[in-house]
Structures are given as C-alpha cells and as structure tokens.
C-alpha cells in the first residue's frame, strides 16, 4: 500500500513560479481556490469571544479634605538631591514650621571672625598662585600669609609742562 500511494508536492512548492508552468489545469484551479479562501474576509475574522469593556471604578468624594494633607510629589532624602529637598520644604505646609525650627537650632561651626581670618589667608595663597615668576622676587610674605610688594611697581610718568 505504501508503494501505491503517490507522494504529493507541498502547496508552497506548487505555488512557486517555475512549478506553475508544468501544472495541469486541474491542479491550477485547485491552487487558485485555496488562495481565494486564504485571502477572503472570513479568513481575517477572529473567532474570539467579544471582550467586555472594562468597567471604570470611580469613587466620588463630597469634600476635598482628603487632599489637604498630601505631600509634594518629588522627594529626596539625606541630601541626595538638594534642589528637590528645597522644593519639598517649600511645598509641604507641615514642614514649613519644622524647617523654621531647624534653621534656628543649627549651630554655627565657625565664627564670623575666624571665617574672615581664613578668607584673608586664602586670598593670599591664591594670589601667590597667579603671580608671575619675575614678580615673585619683588614680593614678600608676612607671617599672616599676606603678600606685600618690596619695591613699588614702576609706572609711566607723565611729562611735566
């Protein structure tokens, strides 16, 4: 029986252009009918059950009191984003009073006088960095770190009339 059964070529192979030249009229008609079935509108219709529209879940509140104690949406903690933390402090009404209390309790690590002295020495040391080589010999450093000129810098003198 297996030897009597003739093997058939696949439909995809028969649709190829070079295979259609040698086909007889009966097989050509059969292929055309199958192609029509595939292209027909019924082929593109999905046999799925109709989907029900999702019911929206809406809750109506009579008052807006629930929205009064909400926090500002953008958040930052432990100085991760300082700009956002500033916005948080401004926008959150509860934190305004707390922020004022925190500002009052902040201790000053460096006094104003000490900061002024540090700034003076800093100006001197940074000034040294930008002095040219030939001018370094003309300047003298005090014990405080300030730089003073040994000789006054020569300047252009106007001729007298």
Curated annotation (Swiss-Prot):
Give the record's keywords alphabetically: Cytoplasm, Isopeptide bond, Nucleus, Phosphoprotein, RNA-binding, rRNA processing, Ubl conjugation
InterPro entries documented for this protein: MPP6
Q: Name one Pfam family in it.
A: MPP6
Cross-link for Glycyl lysine isopeptide (Lys-Gly) (interchain with G-Cter in SUMO2), residue positions: 37, 86, 128, 151, 154
**Example GO biological process:** maturation of 5.8S rRNA
Q: Where is this motif: Nuclear localization signal?
A: 117-134
**Mind telling me what this protein is named?**
M-phase phosphoprotein 6
Organism, by scientific name, is: Mus musculus
């Amino acid at each position: 029986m297996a030897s009597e059964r003739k093997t058939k070529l696949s439909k995809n192979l028969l649709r190829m252009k070079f295979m259609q030249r040698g086909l007889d009229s009966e097989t050509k008609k059969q292929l055309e009918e199958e192609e029509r079935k595939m292209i027909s509108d019924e082929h593109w219709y999905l046999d799925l059950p109709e989907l029900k529209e999702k019911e929206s879940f809406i809750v109506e509140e009579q008052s807006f009191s629930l929205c009064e104690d909400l926090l500002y949406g953008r958040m930052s903690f432990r100085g991760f984003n300082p700009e956002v933390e500033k916005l948080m402090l401004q926008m959150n009404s509860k934190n305004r009073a707390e922020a004022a209390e925190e500002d009052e309790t902040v201790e000053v690590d460096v006094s104003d006088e000490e900061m002024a002295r540090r700034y003076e020495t800093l100006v001197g040391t940074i000034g040294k960095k930008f002095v040219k080589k030939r001018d370094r010999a003309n300047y003298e450093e005090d014990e405080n770190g300030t730089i003073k000129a040994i000789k006054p810098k020569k300047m252009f003198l106007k001729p007298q009339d």
